[in-house]
Structures are given as C-alpha cells and as structure tokens.
Amino acid sequence: MNPFPLVVAEFRRNWLGSAAVIALIATAVALGVALSAQEGALRQASARAADRFDLVVGAPGGPTQLILTTVYLQPAALDLLPAAVLERLQGTPGAVSVAPVAVADSYDGHPVVGTTADFATDGGRIAVVDGRRFSRADEALVGSAVGLPVGTRLRPAHGSPAENIIESHEHGHAFTVVGRLAATASPWDRAIIVPIEGVWAMHDQSLGERDVESPAALGPPWQSGRIGPVPAIVV
C-alpha cells in the first residue's frame, strides 16, 4: 500500500497544522545543529587559548581558579608565589621558557597582564601588526580587541570594580602603548600586556622607579634580589 496519497490528503485537509509541525521540527533540528556548532567552536577556542600553557605553577590553593585567571584572564585575588620560586625555576635545566603572569589590574574594562615580551608574542608566533614589542618597563602591548591606538598613555587600576573582586584604585604608574598584537581568538585579545617589571614597579616590588625606562632591567633572566612575587609562572 502506498502511504503517500494518505499523507498528501491529510496535509490538504489540515495544511495549517501540518505546516506548523514541519516548522517546529525544522526549528528544533536547526537549533540542535547550531548548539552543536557553538559547543565545538567553544571547545576549539578554549583549547587554542591554552595551547601555550604547558605547565602553570601557582601557590597552593584552588587549581581551577589559577587556570581560569592565568589562561582565561578571569579576575581573582590569587595567592602570590615568593620571588625565590621564579628565581629557582629560571635556573632549572631543561626549562626552555619561564614566564611570570600577573593578572591583578584593569583599565577601561580590559585586564592588565604582566609578563614577558616573548610570552606575549608566543615566542614570535603572534605578530605585532602595529608598532613594536615593549622594551621598557613603562610600555605596553594591546590585544587585537583593545581599542587603544599606539601612543596612548594609560594608568591601570588595581582590581576589577565591575567584578567586585578587590577594592579598585588607580595606580600612579603610567604605561605607553607601543604595539598591537594580531588576533588569537582567545581572551588575550582583550588584554593590555605590560612587562612584569612594570607590575613590580607599580606595587613597589623589586624594581624601582629609576629603572622603569631601562631596557636592561627587563628579563629574563632576572637578577637575584630584583624579582617580585607573582601569582603564576608558566613553564
């Protein structure tokens, strides 16, 4: 028996209800496909953001928050590693790269991240599309999604008032934007990246104001007694 004539007859008899059922089925299928595609894209973006974080060293505590803050730049008040840990790690045989990462400040809703120029550019794999890398402790790179042109002077605020993580106040130390990084499709596209020495100077740790304009003051390697505590170290 051929069922198609019955289906056609039923559709003609109640075409409005049949069309509604077809539309609902099509919408459900489309939503399922869209959600699956979004989930896949989110997984890929998350994996891509974590590609260069082979090993993250932090103080004892919550490893999940350490990763969320260091890799995905979610603001949080992390415990600090003593300077001796960074000093010891940078002298470890086989450690190709040792990069401190400090996410504690913000500017105009963008996280201000202290690290090294090599880590900011992933060893040169992330291009500087406008300007150059920072070479002084009072200079900054911006991610592709930060709307600050090269030459902008900015003063970060300690904390993140939008998240109510820690009390916010503006620092007296200013940075000049000297370059813009290519897009990476990661949270770091929204970051303002400064030398870790600039972060230490802002917080009066290890590097004095007299050294912020000296290219020789930027590490690695960092001299003993010239290292401040950091929330995380990427090895």
Model features per residue range: what roles?
Residues 32-111, 121, 136, 222-223:
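Hydrophobic, regular-secondary-structure patches
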Residues 147, 159-168:
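Short, charged beta-turn/beta-strand-edge "cap" motif at the junction between a beta-strand
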Residues 110-157:
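Short beta-strand boundary microenvironments
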Residues 169-174, 180-235:
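Mechanotransmission and gating elements of multispan inner-membrane complexes involved in transport
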Residues 1-33:
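N-terminal Sec/SRP start-transfer signal
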Residues 52, 93, 107-110, 115, ...:
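Extracytoplasmic
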Residues 59, 81, 114-115, 142, ...:
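A conserved hydrophobic position in a structured secondary element of the catalytic/binding core
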